[in-house]
């Protein structure tokens, strides 16, 4: 096959972009360049030895397979290192990534308590947490850890659905420790931030500084640890960070929407370590607990609520505390603007659209995605791997999972008989993009609003 180096490399990049997650592609593949190409050999230049070793270990076969598909015959892929790359000085102070404020520009004297708490939400304290049958064990475990970190439950693994108070409890531990021991080094970080800092450290060749910062803590609070799934190097680095802290008797608290054993593509050794302490499950609150949550929220906001209003809102929102509190805010805002008295009859209209859980039809979703992306429905159901079609198809699968009760195999059938693993991969990829790409996130919000509106109109 007669093809130029530039054309071959562009085609390889295009296909790899579809196969790999965005952070993986931009960190490892996009930074590489095609150096030379003969009939049976492709030479790729990497920016540094670390990148070469990483691509060699995890992505070389994928690149070779893609090149084989394009050329129609096997090709030997060689990796070389760019010449003249300067190694940053060990005294370099600009690491190229933002650590949480606790670690940025440390001074010899201890920082004031308020600076150490700058990454913690001041509202997330134990005194503002409503305890019920659904979260009693998790609350007790967090309080025990806050009083005696690194002893009974280490690590402490909190698991539960979205909006059930995991982050509140984690940060309450941090506030409690700082209150009784102001010099404690408390580190609250999301898994996404850990990954982003790691990527930036690799690019700047600042891994030693990265490790020193992440391992010089007394209590490490890591949120949304489920997002570590499938990120091999992040898992590798977190494994060693975890071991360092645990062996030093430092407390580690993790939060996830599922237990360790149910996190896909999680290294077995990490799963084992996450499970070696206490796993505390948080369930959706019952009616009495939901009413207590609303009452406490109203008290802190100095809002007077009739009992029947509290009971109405608590009965309408059963699974998510964020939605529960959001409904209260909407109701109060509406009454404040309208000047009407706070009654069930007056707030019901503003809560009903959100309360009603409408299920969209697959056709409604296909039409919305087709119109938004300008892609015919038959192409969404087809097998084209053109980037614009693939992205639209993946978004459609994600929205169908969000807005219908269809199983993964059934969603695959709606898209021309795709395998359920393809649907799962698409949903995970779009979920990743939603967190990292503001444009995709906005498109998803607009599509969801459009789908919900169409579903309500159909119901009416």
Curated annotation (Swiss-Prot):
Residues 336-460 are annotated as: Domain IV, binds dsDNA. Residues 1-75 are annotated as: Domain I, interacts with DnaA modulators. It comes from Cyanothece sp. (strain PCC 7425 / ATCC 29141). Coiled coil: none annotated. Residues 119-335 are annotated as: Domain III, AAA+ region. GO terms for molecular function: ATP binding; ATP hydrolysis activity; DNA replication origin binding; lipid binding. GO terms for biological process: DNA replication initiation; regulation of DNA replication. CDD domains: AAA, Bac_DnaA_C. Belongs to the DnaA family. InterPro entries: AAA+_ATPase (IPR003593), Chromosome_initiator_DnaA (IPR001957), Chromosome_initiator_DnaA-like (IPR020591), Chromosome_initiator_DnaA_CS (IPR018312), DnaA_C (IPR013159), DnaA_dom (IPR013317), DnaA_N_dom (IPR024633), DnaA_N_sf (IPR038454). This is Chromosomal replication initiator protein DnaA. The keyword ATP-binding applies. Disulfide bonds: none annotated. Oligomerizes as a right-handed, spiral filament on DNA at oriC. Domain I is involved in oligomerization and binding regulators, domain II is flexibile and of varying length in different bacteria, domain III forms the AAA+ region, while domain IV binds dsDNA. The keyword Magnesium does not apply. Residues 75-118 are annotated as: Domain II.
């Amino acid at each position: 096959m007669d093809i130029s180096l530039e054309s071959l490399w562009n085609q390889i990049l295009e296909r790899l972009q579809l196969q790999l997650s965005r952070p993986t592609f931009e960190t490892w593949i996009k930074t590489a360049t095609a150096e030379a190409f003969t009939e049976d050999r492709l030479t790729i230049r990497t920016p540094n030895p670390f990148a070469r070793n990483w691509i060699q270990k995890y992505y070389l076969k994928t690149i070779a397979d893609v090149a084989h598909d394009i050329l129609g015959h096997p090709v030997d892929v060689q990796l070389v290192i760019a010449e003249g790359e300067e190694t940053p000085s060990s005294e370099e102070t600009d690491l190229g990534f933002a650590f949480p404020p606790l670690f940025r520009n440390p001074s010899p004297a201890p920082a004031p308590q308020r600076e150490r708490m700058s990454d913690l939400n001041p509202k997330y304290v134990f005194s503002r947490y409503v305890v019920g049958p659904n979260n009693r064990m998790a609350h007790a475990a967090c309080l025990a850890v806050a009083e005696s970190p690194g002893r009974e439950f280490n690590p402490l693994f909190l698991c539960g659905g979205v909006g059930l108070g995991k982050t509140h409890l984690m940060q309450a531990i941090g506030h409690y420790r700082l209150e009784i021991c102001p010099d404690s080094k408390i580190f609250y970080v999301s898994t996404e931030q850990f990954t982003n800092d790691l990527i930036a450290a690799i690019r700047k060749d600042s891994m030693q500084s990265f490790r020193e910062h992440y391992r010089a803590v007394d209590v490490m609070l890591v949120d949304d640890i489920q997002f570590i799934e499938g990120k091999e190097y992040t898992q590798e680095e977190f494994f060693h960070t975890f071991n360092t802290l645990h062996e030093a008797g430092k407390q580690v608290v993790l939060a996830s929407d599922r237990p360790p054993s149910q996190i896909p593509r999680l290294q077995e050794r990490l799963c084992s370590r996450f499970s070696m302490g206490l796993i505390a499950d948080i369930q959706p609150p019952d009616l009495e607990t939901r009413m207590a949550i609303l009452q406490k929220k109203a008290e802190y906001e100095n809002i007077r609520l009739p009992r029947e209003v509290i009971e109405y809102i608590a009965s309408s929102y059963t699974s998510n505390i964020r939605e529960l509190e959001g409904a209260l805010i909407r109701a109060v805002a509406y009454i404040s603007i309208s000047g009407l008295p706070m009654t069930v009859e007056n707030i019901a209209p503003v809560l009903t659209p959100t309360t009603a859980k409408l299920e969209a039809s697959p056709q409604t979703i296909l039409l919305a995605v087709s119109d938004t992306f300008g892609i015919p429905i038959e192409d969404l159901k087809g097998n084209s791997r053109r980037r614009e079609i693939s992205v639209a198809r993946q978004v459609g699968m994600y929205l169908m999972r969000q807005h219908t009760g269809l199983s993964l195999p059934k969603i695959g059938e709606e898209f021309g008989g795709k395998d359920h693993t393809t649907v799962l991969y698409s949903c995970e990829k779009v979920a990743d993009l939603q967190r990292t790409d503001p444009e995709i996130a906005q498109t998803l919000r607009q599509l969801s609003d459009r789908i919900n509106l169409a579903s309500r109109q159909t119901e009416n």
